Amino acid sequence: YKRQMLEVVIEENVKFVTTSAGDPAKYIHKLKEADIKVFHAVPSLAGALKAIDAGVDGLVVEGTEGGGFKNPEEVGLHVLIQSIRKHTDLPIVAAGGIVDGIGMAAAFAAGADGIQMGTRFVSSLESPVHENFKGAIVNGSEQGTYILNKKAKPCIRALKTELTDKIYEEGLMDMSALSGIKDLYFGGDMNAAPALAGQSIGLINEV
């Protein structure tokens, strides 16, 4: 499946690819041969060093504050940026907990060259997700998320809901829990699947 995706990317003359989860070395040679720029998402210094050794063109540095798939070590964005910047001059895109110019300026001061926002755009006017999801973000607080599945991996950060309360108490999550993601995003059923969002919900007060 991944090989097919790679072939399509090359055939369609895509110029920029972001990879994540694991070692990019297995993909990067083919992508670079096709003159494609590759940024790899990393949640740790060790992951960044591995990606640098593999020959990536840049890094998306993801702090624990962000929503979605996370590293169980829970290292914050600014510690990560500064730690990684000491080892490379490659472009760094900061991700996790950024919703506005203040967060962007802080990321730049720490050593980033760009930013990536997820939760903020989920709760934007242009976002196609259901109003229930947007409302849960706007009405949430910085303490309104869990990191789930820390004992087993992969971990995810998601909003506190009836569903995630149960998953958190049990300690383990089957990835099939994400199968209802369309019903969550577009049907508005907040318990159809874990609602992936970051701690930045505490900074978002309106759509």
Where are the predicted features?
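Active-site entrance/lid segments in N-terminal catalytic domains of soluble metabolic enzymes
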Residues: K2-H87, P91
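Conserved acidic functional residues
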Residues: A41, G96-G97
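Acidic, glycine-rich active-site loops and adjacent beta-strand->loop/helix elements
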Residues: E65, G97-I98
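Conserved active-site-proximal phosphate/metal-binding subdomains
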Residues: N71-V93, V99-V207
